[in-house]
Structures are given as C-alpha cells and as structure tokens.
C-alpha cells in the first residue's frame, strides 16, 4: 500500500473494513482454499462454498483452528505441514486470479517455462522457519517463503518507521537487541525493523550468545539509547546493571516482547533504569504470536495504547472463550486471528488462547501516532494458565495462574520468583501442590514475604501456596533459565501427565 500512513490516518472504519473484506475474499478464493490441504478439507467437510465467504462477518461460519490442530506430536509429527500453501499446475489454472495467470503467462512467453517456474518457486517454496516456544504444546514450525519475508519486511519497516520517529533517533546513537538469537520471531523482527530503517543496532543474540556482561558493557558505553529484550531477561539485565553500578544515563526507552508486561513490571524496570542514571525513560511492549508471522507493538510515549496491527495484513475478532460466539470489538474475550496475506504456513480463525481485557479491539485513531488501525488492548492473560488443580481429594478447582503475575510483582520485598506445580510425594494419585521459590530483596524479609503472599493469594485466587522456599538469587536465575532459554520458566508444571 503506497502512502500507507496517510491512508491509514485518513480513512474511515468503513473504508478499512471494505479493504479487509476484499483482501479476505481474494485470499481465501485464490490462495487458501485451493492450496491449503487443511482448509480445503475443512471447508469441504463442513459444506462451505468458498465463494460464499464475502466479508469478515462471514468468517463466523468457518470452524476455529487451535494449537492442537497444528502442533506436531508423536502420532503425527508432520501435522503442521497441512497448513502450508502447496500449489500445483492444475489448481493454479483453476483457482489463480486473472492477474496472476496473466503474469505467469507473460513470464512463460517472454522468458520461457523455467522463468515461470522460478516465479512460483519464489512465491511458494519455504526458505525460512521459526518455531513456537512449545509452552502449551510441542514446538511447532511455521514456514516462510520469500513472499512471506517480503510481507514481514513490510510490517517491520512500518513499525520501525513509527518507533524511529517517536524516539527521535539520530546518527551516532545505538540500540541493543538482547532478544535471544534463535529460530524465534522476536530477534528477527528487531533485526529487520532496525536494519530497514538505518538504525545502528547491536544484534547481541542475548545472554546465551554475547553474554550478559558484554551486553552491559555495550549498553553502558555511552551511546545506547534503546534496549530491547524479553521481559525476564530485561529485568535481569537492569538488576545486574544496578548491582554493578553501571551508568545507563544514555538509555531513553525500553522495548520488551514475547511475554506479558503487567503494569507493576513496567514500573519496576523503569525504576531500575532510572536508578542507573536514565532520565525520563519510556517503556513500550510488543505483542503477537508466532502464528501471525510478524509482531505488533505499542507506540512509544503512549500510556498502553495497544498493540498496533495493520488491517491490510491481519483481521482480528473477539470470541467468548466458552461458547465460541463472536463478541463486540469493545468487549473482553479470546483473541482470534485470520491472515489476510501470506504464503507458507497460514491460519484462519486461529484461537490464540489470549484473553484480552475490554476494550479488546480499538479502531479509533491512536492518540500517539494518529493511525486508524486495529489496536489490541495490551492487558492480556492466557487461557493456558487456567489450570485444573486437585487441592483436595474431593474435586478439582480451576486456578487462574495468570493472577500470580499480578499478585507477586506487587510485593516490594520480592526480588525474583518461580512457581512449581507438582504432586505430593510425586504420586500421580495424590493432591496437587503449589511450591513458590522466592528470592527476597534483603535478608530478614522472609516472614513478611510469607505472610503477604499467603494473604494476597488467598484473597485474589482463593488458594494458598503449599510451601514457600527461599533461595539465593543466583540459584533462582538458574531455575528460571534466564540466560539460556527463549523465555523465562516462570510457572513450571511438573505434574505427571
């Protein structure tokens, strides 16, 4: 889309939805239905003619896709492959758009059949892969073609352009990308965004590659204005910087993604960087999920204005997590995603498992950047952390472990923490136990922490921990795997399956 910022700032909601309707129609008819083994079978099995899906409202007729439909397992390790667009000559002739057929015919006429096949190979042959982190299922590969990489570069360039302006980036400044170097999208989104916008960035690879001390050396060298990392590692870096008396006075903003960033967490990391000399630092969170294949973020300087998504690439809806009924955009509900463009691995009506607080989806102009796009409320919890717990032998209790991320960080005496779920005596027929591992801020705070956590958990969650174990920080950092894993191991379920 040319002049995308001008268009997305000036258009009406009706203009935006009209574009999405057209993109959806074209994508389903010319790409998804003919070339996706999974969705062709899904529509055929449910008696849904693809040419009857004309608007985003019509999507409600299509059954949902969830992680269990995609994730490989021992019985079907290749399950994810059925979500890849796989064209063949016959289906291209039958389903491709007139513009595509004309382009292919022209290439064949002017340059020969080899050139035409290379065009198709460029568009459909996978060349890049990232993985889900496997927190709720086995790690799932999502494949990108060169066409997909162009879409990702487009999205990254847009987000980079907005961020670069909002932080007033100047030549000579440097950002530090401390996302882990891995087949995971966070690192690559930052790499693409900064490279395309000409932003000098140390692509450190995180603690596992460059190492925490060297990253801190780079940040404290004097010209680092931005620090980007997953939440747990960002907190670890800043805590370490404070312990070592590092000068971080040049840092002007923090960006985090890959995990939720609750308000208390935001204030904690901002306070840490202020204590290292930063003046009026800003915090911004990025959201998204692997299945989206690119990652939205907030505007810098706004007060949690929501994750920005571009309507020409994605469509979102909210549903009731129990009934599956579509909800109004301003409600609270489970976020459900449909791709409007792409090749490689594609999902339609994908249930993310993320519960978005009201107003879930906001299409009013962003108060910071002015874009009228889909902004997802950044207050999100995970359905996967609603656990069935057998705290007595009589019945199961649904425990919302998302509340731990609200309860524990509000206790000022707590420096670091982890929760382990296990069975009493490791007996699968025994009661469940909730074990908390805590590092106090200072010695002598153990009893205060024990009483406060017990009281807060009883009030907020109607449960109390089975046991609270106090450990030194270095031991808990090892437990959390802060420097060796993509995401910290905050809640560990060690109960037998």
Regions picked out by a protein language model, each given a short descriptive name:
Residues 1-29, 33, 37-38, 174, ...:
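Active-site glycine/GP-rich loop and adjacent strand/helix microenvironment
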Residues 2-6, 66-284, 292-302, 306, ...:
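Active-site phosphate/ATP/adenylate-binding loop shared across adenylate-forming ligases
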